[in-house]
Amino acid sequence: MAYRILVVEDDEDIGDLLEESLTRAGYEVLRAKDGKRALQLVNDSLDLVILDIMMPGISGIETCQHIRKSSNVPILFLTARSSTLDKTEGLLAGGDDYMTKPFSEEELHARVIAQLRRYTIYQEKKEQEETFLIGGKLRVSEEFNEVWKEEKQIKLSDLEYRILKLLMNKRNKIFSAQNIYESVWGQPYFYCSNNTVMVHIRKLRSKIEDDPARPVYIKTEWGRGYRFGAS
């Protein structure tokens, strides 16, 4: 299967050149002319993003920061901005490499190959090391603190993740609010702590349930507590 590369470039001629060159090298190329469209195309099937900085609307720096909230896909900046400050800003925003225009196709291909090689090694290592908790459509990574629902990653806070992991590790066991608070927060339970747990359960349901009003994953056992309900 060919590697999939997203080219984010508002200049039509440069975008065409990149697409033609990368396609000729055997890659599958997707195109976006701005950051907004790029964010719509970013998903788990991408292997590399080639990203301009000066674009209409969302800049390449902002686009990179948004991508980094949910994805570790390699990002190669390709831009006319060539100062040391520009390069530093791009790398600190989450970029993995930085090239300036004008560029040679030979160097571009070398950098693409290097990024894809590193990413492939990272993915293989991650698959070997990673163990999951699975329930229904949910898949929870215990090593990387990641939660997936089918093929979509769900962003949880650290406390929400720890609540979900606690419940999934003991299927069908009922955890009282006190059990959850003392296990997750690691602090003595007080009466007002019940509201804290309820608020976080509600937020967690809003992110993982198809219908939070009729939860499938986080079940309430009235007067007793909560349990993970999906098999």
Swiss-Prot record:
PROSITE patterns attached to this UniProt entry: OMPR_PHOB, RESPONSE_REGULATORY
Residue positions where 4-aspartylphosphate is found in the record: D52
Modification after translation: Phosphorylated by YrkQ.
Classification via InterPro entries: CheY-like_superfamily, OmpR/PhoB-type_DNA-bd, Sig_transdc_resp-reg_C-effctor, Sig_transdc_resp-reg_receiver, WalR-like, WH-like_DNA-bd_sf
GO MF terms held by the record: phosphorelay response regulator activity; transcription cis-regulatory region binding
DNA-binding region: 129-230
Gene Ontology cellular component annotations, sorted alphabetically: cytosol; protein-DNA complex
Locations listed in the record: Cytoplasm
GO BP terms in the entry: regulation of DNA-templated transcription
Domain Response regulatory: 4-116
Top-level taxon: Bacteria
Keywords of this entry: Cytoplasm, DNA-binding, Phosphoprotein, Transcription, Transcription regulation, Two-component regulatory system
The protein's role, per its UniProt record: Member of the two-component regulatory system YrkQ/YrkP.
Name of protein: Uncharacterized transcriptional regulatory protein YrkP
Protein encoded by which gene: yrkP
